[in-house]
């Protein structure tokens, strides 16, 4: 097989607000680096209580369609100026449903959505769309946050200032977190990036009250986990990927955010199921807190991601 059917498929969901610019940058840059096909979707949503069947509202819908089509043409021109070809889609309806329908129709391998500034998921570009897409999309979802002070930089256009040199992957050794490591490894190969594997020693995760354990026991557990992470980093190194690992104590989401800031990470890749913490995806406090507060993009990988026929980068770490 050859042609576009072989290439990765990226879907960018946008409302064309200034907060969507950063997500546009990432979608275009990933499409260029991966040699992927890129589809841009915008969804026209009627205000609550407005019946689209009324003639006057049909006129309103026509104006929305005209404005949306114009914005898609402009985005396509911006991308074409950088050698990036893309397809466009425009839909009417409930944004989250239309995004998920487009994911299915396009058989997307990745969805890119944006979030606005400091309140994160409370102000997702498409209302509650990003949260619902992350919960239910069959493919990974890249959530790109944008703060007010990032807007002027993003207005430079796609691929301005984007780097994916350092990737952080929280690991709890569940199947889903190992699938996230696998996805991150593939991204690291594509972008010549380094990986940092992070395990947070949270007492509740192991059914233990560390305040009652002797220091020697705590160190024994830490050493065992450090050794296991060491095995994974060696497997990554054998795959020609620069990697290191960390074992930290504390509250999981705070440790993840602190590590991301310290590295500093350009991307966090997280599994959406697992033992605890990362296990509950958006319905749990850890991943939700990371998505709300992370200054760098967060890529969520829903498990199971890879079928038995997938040739893994980390064959020794197969789930």
List each model region and its residues.
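Gly/Ser-rich helix-loop-strand patches that form or flank binding pockets
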Residues: 1-9, 29-33, 100-153, 258-318
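Small/aliphatic-rich secondary-structure junction motif
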Residues: 2-58, 161-211, 244-246, 293, ...
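Well-ordered alpha-helical segments embedded in enzymatic catalytic cores
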Residues: 23-26, 71, 98, 228, ...
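A short acidic, glycine-rich active-site loop
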Residues: 57-70, 214-227
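Short helix-capping segments at alpha-helix termini
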Residues: 78-84, 235-241
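Rossmann-fold cofactor-recognition segment
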Residues: 85-89, 243-245
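Charged docking surfaces used in two-component/phosphorelay signaling
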Residues: 90-99, 247-255
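Glycine-rich phosphate/pyrophosphate-binding loop and the adjoining helix
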Residues: 196, 200-226, 232-237
């Amino acid at each position: 097989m050859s042609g576009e059917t072989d290439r990765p498929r990226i879907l960018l969901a946008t409302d064309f607000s200034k907060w969507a610019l950063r997500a546009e940058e990432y979608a275009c840059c990933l499409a260029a680096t991966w040699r992927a096909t890129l589809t841009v979707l915008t969804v026209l949503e009627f205000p609550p209580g407005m019946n689209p069947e009324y003639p006057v509202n049909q006129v309103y819908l026509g104006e929305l369609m005209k404005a949306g089509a114009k914005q898609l043409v402009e985005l396509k021109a911006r991308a074409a100026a950088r050698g990036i070809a893309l397809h466009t889609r425009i839909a009417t309806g409930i944004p989250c449903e239309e995004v998920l329908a487009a994911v299915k129709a396009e058989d997307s391998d990745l969805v890119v959505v944006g979030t606005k500034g400091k309140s994160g998921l409370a102000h997702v570009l498409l209302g509650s769309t990003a949260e619902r897409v992350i919960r239910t999309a069959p493919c990974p979802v890249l959530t790109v946050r944008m703060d007010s002070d990032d807007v002027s930089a993003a207005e430079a256009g796609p691929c301005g200032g984007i780097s994916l040199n350092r990737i952080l992957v929280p690991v709890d050794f569940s199947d889903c977190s190992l699938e996230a490591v696998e996805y991150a490894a593939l991204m690291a190969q594509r972008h010549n990036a380094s990986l940092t594997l992070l395990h947070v020693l949270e007492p509740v995760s192991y059914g233990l009250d560390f305040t009652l354990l002797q220091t020697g026991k705590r160190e024994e557990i830490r050493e065992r986990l450090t050794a296991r992470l060491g095995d994974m980093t060696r497997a990554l190194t054998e795959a020609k990927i620069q990697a290191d690992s960390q074992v930290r104590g504390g509250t999981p989401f705070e440790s993840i955010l602190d590590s991301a800031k310290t590295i500093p990470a350009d991307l966090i890749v997280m599994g959406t199921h697992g033992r605890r913490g990362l296990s509950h995806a958006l319905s749990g406090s850890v991943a939700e807190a990371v998505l709300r507060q992370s200054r760098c993009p967060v890529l969520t990988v829903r498990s199971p991601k890879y079928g038995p026929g997938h040739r893994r980068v980390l064959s020794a770490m197969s789930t």
